[in-house]
């Protein structure tokens, strides 16, 4: 009996160590994909605003960002998306239960003083289709984003009109610089 307990404890410790090692490895790989995605998205946004004003950045979110996310997803066999508790595009940005829980936890962490830029979460989860590695990296609202995501008085009338046309059910406004706009979410089967 003592041997069985010792063997069980040893297996549990070994499994825990392997699990932690896998999560760490997958987290690094996911971060290596998420960070360039965010950097490239910011560059596309900046370019659009410089070329055509704040209203031009809407095209980045409606066309360029989904294409970038789709390309990355196909290249890696993962699902990469942007999600938020205040969704602009319900077809692409609505969080699943895991994402919603973690976005709410991010908000609680901000309330305790943690910096948005450092926030991420990673874990292996059991789902009906099997095990998946899940990763989320919080997105902080930048100063250049308030023209589309700020308070009503910060959003120019032409941008409001375009947003109303493109996103009739838009909830992604009312943010301030530094607040959590949402997160990049990666889901990969393991």
Predicted regions and their residues:
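Short, linear, compositionally biased motifs with a strong N-terminal bias
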Residues: 10-12
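Extracytoplasmic c-type cytochrome modules immediately beyond a signal peptide or single-pass transmembrane anchor
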Residues: 20-142, 154-190
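Bacterial N-terminal signal peptides that target proteins for export
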Residues: 1-7
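N-terminal signal peptide c-region/cleavage motif recognized by signal peptidases
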Residues: 14-17
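Detector for the c-type heme attachment site
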Residues: 146-153
